[in-house]
Amino acid sequence: QWSGRATLKNYFSVGIWSNYRPMGINDFFEPRVDGRVFKQDASYHAMTWMSTDYRKTLAFDLKGSYGRGNGQRYSYELGPRVRVNHKAVFRYKFKFDLDANEKGYVTDYHPQEDSIIFGNRNKETYTNTVGGSYVFDNKTWITLNVRHYWSKVDYDQFYNLKENGRLEQHENYSGNEDFNFNVFNVDLMYSWNFAPGSFLNVVWKNSIYESQTIENNTFNNFFENFQDTMNSNAVENSFSIKVSYYLDYKYLFKNSG
């Protein structure tokens, strides 16, 4: 594994990262059964990114990556940000991930026979995030993030996971495992730095979930999918207050002595 980054005189930053696993990996999580393993072959992953000058009113982040091992993985991100003034910043980020011909767990077909079904799948994931922050003063600020996560998975072949961790084609399994999954999140947080190293955070979170099995490979388009998500009854809300207080033991011991 290696990485590098550089920042130019105009505050334009670039970076690169790469990872290579020549021996492959033993994945003990993907089978979902204690004592079983899924052996994956050698893999590599490379990523590059760039960022323009954040001091300017308009700035951009761009990232792209490619990986090969358990299938092929393509990913890219685009994130413009607008700095209104020294108090307010707004951000948008779009991320797309494609896992092509990835092998992964599907179900325990015959759990009494320790038969574990894997599938060959294409998984597309779209994430849109809009956020912003506003600083009231040097001790208090508020942040808001709104995110829509959409993942759709299409299976075209099924396998049996053998005891040696390898896959063999399964001729009899014919279940429909194609699915569509969405999450819509709203996160609002107020922060107060009431003492050095000490914070009060008040957080409200709202989440909407939508999941469905897809028949005959008939996935909805983005707008139909988003509308189904907003009409879902699977809604969660949470409210939390967290206080973190920094204690300087040297200061306490000094005063007590």
Question: What are these model-predicted stretches?
Answer:
Residues 1-257:
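Exposed, low-structure sequence patches enriched in small/polar residues
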